[in-house]
Every structure is written in structure tokens, then in C-alpha cells.
């Protein structure tokens, strides 16, 4: 009995021992981390009540370019039902071979900005809708079981007419 209680005590100590966090282990995409590591992940981009919402039946594509030493990722989200295409032009430091995770604010092509001149909606009749303000949040699992990066992209834009354009896309981006 004495040996059994010692064995159980050792088993309890080993079972309760904290695991060592491996910084090389990728964090799967999620919409929040409860303030544990990357605070930007806790920021919510509200897509509710949008006049135009890119969510279901969307095909996502990306073109990877380089501009002034920055990664210039040009994303298109095509709505198969309406024929609308949302273009996102994101700039980030050249770190990964996929779209850099983070929050992109409206800007002019500096690091971690969504370029205000090249983020817009293209309508089937070839007209464009430009935005006056916006934000994009990108979460990525670069080691998804499919073998390709898996993205969760949320975005919210406003145009001159105060219409809200939003995106909540989950899936892979086909490289062009």
C-alpha cells in the first residue's frame, strides 16, 4: 500500500507539471487569444449590419508582390452569387511566404496598412466603389492539415455614402 501511495503521488506530480511552451509550434487560427500573447488577435472587427457582406460562397485569391522592400499582398474575394469582387491591397514586412497575420489600417502603402487607393469593390458593370476608411484583420494557420495556409480574414470599410462593406472569409487563398 505504501508503494502504491508513493506511485500515485509521483503520478500526480508529473501529471500536474506545466508543459513548456514551444515558440516554434504554430498557433492555430482563432478569433481571440484572451490577452495571452498577441493583443491584436483580441480586437474584433464588427461585420454585423453591413450593407455589403462578403461571407458565404466566396472564392479567395492572392497575388504576392514586392514593393519598396515590403510584401504587397493583393487579395481578391469574389462573391459567386452577386458577381461583386472585394479587392484588398495589404502591405507588411517581408517575413513570411504567406499573408502576414495582423491588423491592417487604412494607409498609403506603409507597413501593416491596407492601401486606400487599391482597396475597393468591383461591380459586374465595371464600376468601382471606393472607401473612405477601413481595417483588415488577418489570422493564418500556415501549417494547416491541407498543406496550404488557412486564413480567417475580417474587414470593415465605409464609403462616402456611409455604407458599410464587410468581409468575414475563412478558407484558403488561391495563389495567382
Predicted regions: what they are:
Residues 35, 39-40, 152-176:
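Edge beta-strand at a domain terminus
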Residues 27-33, 136-150:
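N-terminal helix-cap/turn-to-beta initiation motif at the start of protein domains
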Residues 1-14:
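Sec-dependent bacterial lipoprotein signal peptides
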Residues 20-28, 106, 140-142, 174-175:
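Primarily marks secretory-pathway-exposed extracellular/lumenal segments that are disulfide-
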Residues 13-48:
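Bacterial Sec-dependent N-terminal signal peptides
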Residues 52-145:
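Surface-exposed helix/loop patches within compact recognition domains
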Residues 84, 134, 147-151, 163-167:
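Residues at beta-strand starts and edge strands
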Amino acid at each position: 500500500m505504501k508503494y502504491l501511495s508513493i506511485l500515485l503521488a509521483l503520478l500526480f506530480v508529473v501529471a500536474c507539471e506545466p508543459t513548456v511552451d514551444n515558440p516554434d509550434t504554430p498557433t492555430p487560427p482563432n478569433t481571440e487569444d484572451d490577452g495571452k500573447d498577441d493583443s491584436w488577435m483580441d480586437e474584433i472587427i464588427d461585420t454585423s449590419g453591413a450593407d455589403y457582406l462578403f461571407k458565404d460562397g466566396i472564392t479567395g485569391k492572392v497575388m504576392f508582390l514586392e514593393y519598396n522592400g515590403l510584401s504587397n499582398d493583393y487579395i481578391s474575394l469574389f462573391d459567386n452569387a452577386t458577381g461583386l469582387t472585394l479587392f484588398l491591397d495589404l502591405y507588411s514586412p517581408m517575413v513570411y511566404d504567406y499573408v502576414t497575420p495582423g491588423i491592417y489600417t487604412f494607409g498609403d502603402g506603409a507597413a501593416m496598412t491596407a492601401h486606400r487607393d487599391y482597396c475597393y469593390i468591383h461591380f459586374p458593370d465595371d464600376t468601382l466603389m471606393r472607401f473612405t476608411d477601413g481595417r483588415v484583420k488577418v489570422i493564418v494557420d500556415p501549417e494547416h492539415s491541407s498543406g496550404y495556409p488557412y486564413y480567417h480574414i475580417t474587414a470593415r470599410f465605409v464609403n462616402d455614402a456611409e455604407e458599410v462593406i464587410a468581409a468575414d472569409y475563412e478558407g484558403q487563398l488561391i495563389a495567382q
